[in-house]
């Protein structure tokens, strides 16, 4: 049975452009990166986070004043990997707009709400889910206790990030994240995870990147 990732990569379209030096071919994602569009797709893990961070840093170096658009369709994943992307979004100079296409769950929802104020969007049929971090451990009792303390510390830090970007109280965030909380795009806007639900690209495309 073929690797589904390999099959997927073989299906990525190529775009051919005419230049003064002849034809140049790009895969579709590289071509969209030229337009300052980044895709956060699939589970959040170290390899994926490294690629996203590299793209953010590259686009900052290319033009530190021009917005970057981040399209998110992710079920979430590793907390530390997601925080690497989050910290880089806050670190770089360009404003980063975020748009949920499909789903933004767990760390995906944190990245969605971490976009620049008034530049956080969702398509109307997307789903957003927030919850507290989870983990399973085995070993000596002392080690299990240390891991539990680290999970609680991460939970507190994630809650603080949601408070910062949603405007909700710490108690409201703590209650919302106690269990899996699924939100429609409209409910996510009311909660402060996004700024607006959009079904058409704005006439002024600047906040979404051209």
Curated annotation (Swiss-Prot):
Annotated GO MF terms: ATP-dependent peptidase activity; ATPase binding; serine-type endopeptidase activity
Recorded catalytic activity of this chain's protein: Hydrolysis of proteins to small peptides in the presence of ATP and magnesium. alpha-casein is the usual test substrate. In the absence of ATP, only oligopeptides shorter than five residues are hydrolyzed (such as succinyl-Leu-Tyr-|-NHMec, and Leu-Tyr-Leu-|-Tyr-Trp, in which cleavage of the -Tyr-|-Leu- and -Tyr-|-Trp bonds also occurs)
BP terms from Gene Ontology: protein quality control for misfolded or incompletely synthesized proteins
Organism: Bradyrhizobium sp. (strain BTAi1 / ATCC BAA-1182)
UniProt-annotated catalytic positions: 106, 131
Main enzyme class: hydrolase
Subcellular location: Cytoplasm
Main location, first listed in the record: cytoplasm
Assembly, per entry: Fourteen ClpP subunits assemble into 2 heptameric rings which stack back to back to give a disk-like structure with a central cavity, resembling the structure of eukaryotic proteasomes.
Function: Cleaves peptides in various proteins in a process that requires ATP hydrolysis. Has a chymotrypsin-like activity. Plays a major role in the degradation of misfolded proteins.
Pfam family, one: CLP_protease
Protein name from the UniProt record: ATP-dependent Clp protease proteolytic subunit
A GO CC term attached to the entry: endopeptidase Clp complex
Record family assignment: Belongs to the peptidase S14 family.
Protease is among the record's keywords: yes
Entry keywords, A to Z: Cytoplasm, Hydrolase, Protease, Serine protease
Keyword ATP-binding listed: no
Documented EC number(s): 3.4.21.92
